[in-house]
Amino acid sequence: LEIRMNASTGRIQPDISAESTVSAPPKKTQIIAIYGKGGIGKSFTLANLSFMMAEQGKRVLLIGCDPKSDTTSLLFGGKSCPTIIETSAKKKAAGEVVTIGDVCFKRDGVFAMELGGPEVGRGCGGRGIIHGFELLDKLGFQDWDFDYVLLDFLGDVVCGGFGLPIARDLCQKVIVVASNDLQSLYVANNVCSAVDYFRNLGGNVGVAGMVINKDDGTGEAQAFCDVVGIPILAAIPADDDIRRKSANYEIIGTAASQWGGLFEALGIAVAEAPPVRPKPLTQDGLLGLFKGEAVGRGVELAPASFADMCGVTYVEKPSLEVVYEGA
């Protein structure tokens, strides 16, 4: 599924020719995919960002594209949205048709939905994402009119379904959420590698920048962005007040919050940041951002032997050779 914008109406128009890579005309709607390591704070960032954008008078659609289906829980005070895939299956079994009101919900100007996915061990999450976008098309996605469509994607998985926005130019730009730790920057680097790869194939998606979440001031994420060539859109501090409010499903991306200015600035940065082609790091380059003792750079690879694998002293036994007369 490829989404383009109709130049005359400024609205989203789907093109389900998966192989086409035609450059899209200028778009009114900014479609932005957010990637990051599981648990890094993508949903927290997006819920507060979308709320602030709505306060700024923008029309915002937030779509959770993670099988955990927890993107919208903070926005709705801990309540879970019925997912598109689950609702579609139930409606189909009952001989009914899915309507927008079955799967899309709103709060203070933010519209939100969850694509969902299969139950654990019972299907392919990436395929579920593709199927979810097909269902969105049937719901009239091409006629919806938003200033921003924010897609919350899992970043740990390299499956093509989760890479759909990058591979098929579904979005104009990507934002990565990370922190000052190796694991989250490893995922961010993988996302940058995917963007760079599809740019080589003629794609148009670029990285708009990084949001540093739980920033402890150690600087590894800043160093990563400097080397890869992407800007920092915001640095959300590792603050106990933020942690408590997030745990209590309290929105802080509002002008009434002491953190409102942070998300107001993030909203402006997200809107204005151009998509750029990143320069992903090698594994050694990524490890080089950290102190040697933190990543074990003094360790050498020692080859294992068959005897090691058997766990006992191994004595090679001679084989029985069979000799045939006249051979």
What are the functions of these language-model segments?
Residues 55, 138-148, 153-238, 243-244:
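Conserved catalytic-core segment of NTP-binding enzymes
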Residues 2-26, 197-327:
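C-terminal lobe/tail of nucleotide-utilizing enzymes
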Residues 1-40, 44-59:
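Extreme N-terminal, non-catalytic leader segments
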